Amino acid sequence: MANQTIIPEIEANHESMTAWRRDIHANPELGFEEYRTSAMVAEKLKSWGLEVHQGLGKTGVIGTLRVGNDTRSIGLRADMDALPMAENNTFSHKSTNPNVMHACGHDGHTTMLLGAAKYLAESKNFEGCVHFIFQPGEEGVGGAKAMVEDGLFDQFPCDSVYGMHNRPGMAIGKFGMRSGAAMACLLYTSPSPRDVEE
């Protein structure tokens, strides 16, 4: 990883963040059943002084951090749910829930957003408002829709929202961005791919 740097305060939290991810990985929960995960997220956000709202979109969590008088606001979003599949790994933090597994990286996504929230809450090196959006039910059960219908952007208006998802195959230290909608689709109404609109 030549010429790459990690913010020292984030690097200092590496062990804690690894423990968070492993805990979430070992205790996966399906969409709209993320009770343990959302409670863990809310507890950590509160401990860092964020304003926390739970239950949006059933099990979603919003942490709000305001710094200074700037009225601009952004949303940073990560998903929390796991997939209905058995985990065959043998490491110590493998799934303890039969036939439920974090196979899509949402344990990492949740951890990364928690790490960002902790860093920004401690450093306060910006002006404005950040809404940390922890989304339930991303895996095909309509978690984003449920949050929006519960008033996500009415209660927590954002000038822009940045959603994040890991992408195997992308070089370490790189990230991709696009303007406009991303990572969105309609709920599947048919098993036929030709019936799914993107």
Predicted regions and their residues:
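Fold-level recognition of mixed alpha/beta catalytic cores in primary-metabolism enzymes, strongest
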Residues: 126-190
